[in-house]
């Protein structure tokens, strides 16, 4: 009861009063006090207005135009995203180190159904997008504890080495192959290893993935890491058909190099077909451009030239043949041809030293023959000509 009486004694707020009550609160006279009107009169006195109108009767008063609000500065366009460049190019030279570090790959053919195949002659791995690529790590002796394995991709050609290898914009934005662990711009991923670390170097801007080195199992002699390549080699805005190298390094816990090896990678739709094509091109190139010793070709030329006329030298062992020819013109034609052949053989040295004597003896033996046969042959041709 006491609380209810206290609530009744509280005056209502101002908003609950009537308009008449509010009106009565205003003063009865001098709604606008002189204190407020005085400053208004000082702003523009009457005498000043009259003088101003007398001086400029034909001009209308011009009010000062309100200053236009300052236009906001034009928005600068966002800078185009350019590929980061790195002045540091990692070495790709093979370095087995003290532990005999080297790489190995599973043997696979060139069938169309393969998703990953390695060519030993090209030292090149052909694989499909986001498919498993097992890479074997071989060592002669176990490395120290805390050893890590780093994988990094660089461009193979010299003019592209300073550019950082990354995925194309389309695959970066795509969520089809997102695992939530690897950054979308990284090209190389490790499959089935939650201890993988994806690093972006602040100085070189290059991407790499690092996993702890694990010793081989009891029934195995090597350690296998399954890599994925998350962008095609032909993607525009990414690799753009530029060949790349994957560098695998063995490092200790402080980052010191223990071993290095590398191989070329091509991410394509049909690895078996591309491997077969490139191996055939390499084979044709090797056949068309052999690399023999510098003097071997010079020695081969005279042996070929001397061996080629040997079959023609056998019938010229001093044996002569007689050919009956009808007509003097035909005889002269064959004689000139025979003399030319004899001269050619003499110049080439295909006959023994007495070849000239034999050729002169042959000419003296064959020349009188047409005189004795000329008359009867002319007599035979006489009736035919008539």
UniProtKB/Swiss-Prot annotation:
Modified residues (N6-methyllysine): 363, 365, 375
Residue numbers spanned by region Interaction with USP7: 352-356
Entry-annotated residues carrying N6-acetyllysine: 112, 298, 314, 366, 374-375
Residue span of region Interaction with HIPK1: 92-363
DNA-binding residue intervals: 94-285
UniProt short sequence motif Nuclear export signal, positions renumbered to this chain: 332-343
InterPro entries in the cross-refs: p53-like_TF_DNA-bd_sf, p53/RUNT-type_TF_DNA-bd_sf, p53_DNA-bd, p53_tetramer_sf, p53_tetrameristn, p53_transactivation_domain, p53_tumour_suppressor
Region annotation (Oligomerization) ranges: 318-349
Cofactor dependency: Zn(2+)
Region (Interaction with DNA): 266-273
Covalent cross-link (Glycyl lysine isopeptide (Lys-Gly) (interchain with G-Cter in SUMO)), residues: 379
Positions carrying N6-lactoyllysine: 112, 131
Family: Belongs to the p53 family.
The protein's name: Cellular tumor antigen p53
Organismal lineage: Eukaryota, Metazoa, Chordata, Craniata, Vertebrata
Gene that encodes it: TP53
């Amino acid at each position: 009861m006491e609380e209810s009486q206290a609530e009744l004694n509280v005056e209502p707020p101002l908003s609950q009063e009537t308009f008449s009550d509010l009106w009565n609160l205003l003063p009865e006279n001098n709604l606008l006090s002189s204190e407020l009107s005085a400053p208004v009169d000082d702003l523009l006195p009457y005498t000043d207005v009259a003088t101003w109108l007398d001086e400029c009767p034909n001009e209308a008063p011009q009010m000062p135009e309100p200053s236009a609000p300052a236009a906001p500065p034009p928005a600068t366009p966002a800078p185009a995203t350019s590929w980061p460049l790195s002045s540091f190019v990692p070495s790709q030279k093979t370095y087995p180190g003290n532990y005999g570090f080297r790489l190995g790959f599973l043997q696979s053919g060139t069938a169309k159904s393969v998703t990953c195949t390695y060519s030993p002659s090209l030292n090149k791995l052909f694989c499909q997008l986001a498919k498993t690529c097992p890479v074997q790590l071989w060592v002669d002796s176990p490395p120290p504890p805390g050893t890590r394995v780093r994988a990094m991709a660089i461009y193979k050609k010299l003019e592209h080495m300073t550019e950082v290898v990354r995925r194309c914009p389309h695959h970066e934005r795509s969520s089809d192959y997102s695992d939530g662990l690897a950054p979308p711009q990284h090209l190389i991923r490790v499959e089935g290893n939650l201890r993988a670390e994806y690093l972006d170097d602040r100085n070189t801007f290059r991407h790499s993935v690092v996993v702890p080195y694990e010793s081989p199992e009891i029934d195995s002699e090597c350690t296998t890491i399954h890599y994925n390549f998350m962008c095609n080699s032909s993607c525009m805005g990414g690799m753009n058909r530029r060949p790349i190298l994957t560098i695998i390094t063995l490092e200790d816990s402080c980052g010191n190099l223990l071993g290095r090896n590398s191989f070329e990678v091509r991410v394509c739709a049909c690895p078996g077909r591309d491997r077969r094509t490139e191996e055939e091109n390499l084979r044709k190139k090797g056949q068309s451009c052999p690399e023999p010793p510098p003097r071997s070709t010079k020695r081969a030329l005279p042996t070929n030239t001397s061996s080629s006329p040997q079959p023609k030298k056998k019938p010229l062992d001093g044996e002569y043949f007689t050919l009956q020819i009808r007509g003097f013109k035909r005889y002269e034609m064959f004689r000139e041809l025979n003399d030319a052949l004899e001269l050619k053989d003499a110049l080439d040295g295909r006959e023994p030293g007495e070849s000239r004597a034999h050729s002169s003896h042959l000419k003296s033996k064959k020349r009188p023959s047409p005189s004795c046969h000329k008359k009867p042959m002319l007599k035979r041709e006489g009736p035919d000509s008539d």
